[in-house]
């Protein structure tokens, strides 16, 4: 059964978008899905379950369903005007519209464990789960903290990531994408990009302003070759550009709690060289790390310049430190660096 696709005339009548933005042009969506080549991962899309968070006007939802005909497609949308719009447009369709809040953690335990409305298949972590996909639109202001929480869930293998390596297609402001995808040494490098690099393989798939590409690593842009579209193809048209990223969890082999402590404290002072910043990990830290780090060039680096492997190396040394502090007694705000420029 084909699902009707809302048009620009339909969505332009809506008054409230709650600060979020949505691509409306089906032609661009088709280019995006061709680029993603999702059937490589989901060889049997008829067995796929899709959880759509903040679907808004549902254009992407309808196009996705018509293209892949998944076994189950559930939309979590609590915002009043958008929920009413979805119900009116998709009444009687195979799309499952649920008035639930994607921001509320209890939504998922209720949906999956208690009511069993949406129950994904648990798969081993040696591959991307080929029967469960998550898509989300967090293009509103202040979404960065939520993305950080989701990234942390990948590291802790909880929330939706207890079902294995679950791919996520994520719309966000282009400024957030730039910070998320920043490489070592870039001005926008932050704890957000450090976490992303440690736990995921994330690619820029599409963006609504070519000028925004200047803020990304040029080699990465050449590799990703993102689809470009115009502000006229998103609604509402005013405001910041938006971007789509593809996020795949990856393997990692380090102690997450100790790694989080080390990266969090160092990134707060991200432009201070290691040869003077290590006391931030605990009293006596500078003397200890100076004696243990054999590569003296590493000591000249600032946290903003460190690679994922270098953070893991420092975490290993931290765990071997006889006088390391009790990380469970740490009360530093994990998002402090995300608002520190």
Swiss-Prot record:
It is an enzyme of class 2 (transferase). The keyword Amino-acid biosynthesis does not apply. GO terms for cellular component: mitochondrial DNA-directed RNA polymerase complex; mitochondrial intermembrane space; mitochondrial matrix; mitochondrion. One of its GO terms (molecular function) is mitochondrial transcription factor activity. Transmembrane segments: none annotated. PROSITE patterns: SAM_RNA_A_N6_MT (PS51689). It comes from the Eukaryota. Pfam families: RrnaAD. GO terms for biological process: methylation; mitochondrial transcription; positive regulation of DNA-templated transcription, elongation; transcription initiation at mitochondrial promoter. Keywords: DNA-binding, Methyltransferase, Mitochondrion, RNA-binding, S-adenosyl-L-methionine, Transcription, Transcription regulation, Transferase. The keyword Transferase applies. It is found in: Mitochondrion intermembrane space. Its main location: mitochondrion. S-adenosyl-L-methionine binds at residues 23, 77, 101, 137. Its EC number is 2.1.1.-. InterPro entries: KsgA/Erm, Mtf1, rRNA_Ade_diMease-like_C, SAM-dependent_MTases_sf. Belongs to the class I-like SAM-binding methyltransferase superfamily. rRNA adenine N(6)-methyltransferase family. Mitochondrial transcription factor that confers selective promoter recognition on the core subunit of the yeast mitochondrial RNA polymerase. Interacts with DNA in a non-specific manner. Present with 9380 molecules/cell in log phase SD medium. Although strongly related to dimethyladenosine transferase proteins, it lacks the methyltransferase activity. Dimethyladenosine transferase methylates the 2 adjacent adenosines in the loop of a conserved hairpin near the 3'-end of 12S mitochondrial rRNA in most species. This explains why 12S rRNA is not methylated in S.cerevisiae. This is Mitochondrial transcription factor 1. It comes from Saccharomyces cerevisiae (strain ATCC 204508 / S288c) (Baker's yeast). The gene is MTF1.
């Amino acid at each position: 059964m084909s699902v009707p696709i809302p048009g620009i005339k339909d969505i332009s009548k809506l008054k409230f978008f709650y600060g979020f933005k949505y691509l409306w042009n089906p032609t661009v969506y088709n280019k995006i899905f061709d680029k993603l080549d999702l059937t490589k991962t989901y060889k049997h899309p008829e067995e796929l379950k899709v959880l759509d968070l903040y679907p808004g006007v549902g254009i992407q939802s309808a196009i996705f369903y018509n293209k892949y005909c998944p076994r189950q497609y559930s939309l979590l949308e609590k915002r009043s005007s958008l929920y009413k719009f979805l119900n009116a447009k998709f009444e009687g369709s195979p799309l499952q519209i649920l008035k639930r809040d994607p921001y509320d953690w209890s939504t998922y335990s209720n949906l999956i464990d208690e009511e069993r409305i949406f129950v994904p298949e648990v798969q081993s972590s040696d591959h991307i789960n080929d029967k469960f996909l998550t898509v989300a639109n967090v293009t509103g202001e202040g979404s960065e903290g939520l993305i950080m929480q989701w990234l942390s869930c990948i590291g802790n293998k909880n929330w939706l990531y207890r079902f294995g390596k679950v791919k996520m297609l994520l719309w966000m402001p282009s400024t957030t994408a730039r910070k998320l995808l920043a490489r070592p040494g870039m001005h926008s490098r932050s704890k957000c990009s450090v976490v992303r690099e440690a736990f995921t393989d994330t690619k820029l798939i599409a963006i609504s302003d070519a000028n925004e590409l200047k803020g990304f690593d040029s080699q990465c842009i050449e590799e990703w070759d993102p689809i470009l579209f115009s502000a006229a193809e998103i609604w509402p048209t005013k405001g910041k550009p938006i971007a789509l990223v593809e996020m795949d969890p990856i393997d990692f082999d380090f102690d997450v709690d100790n790694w989080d402590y080390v990266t969090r404290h160092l990134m707060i002072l991200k432009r201070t060289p290691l040869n003077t910043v290590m006391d931030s990990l605990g009293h006596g830290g500078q003397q200890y790390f100076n004696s243990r780090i054999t590569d003296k060039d590493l000591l000249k680096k600032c946290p903003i310049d460190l690679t994922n492997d270098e953070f893991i190396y420092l975490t290993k040394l931290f765990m071997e430190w006889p006088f390391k502090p009790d990380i469970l007694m740490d009360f530093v705000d994990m998002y402090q660096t995300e608002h520190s420029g």
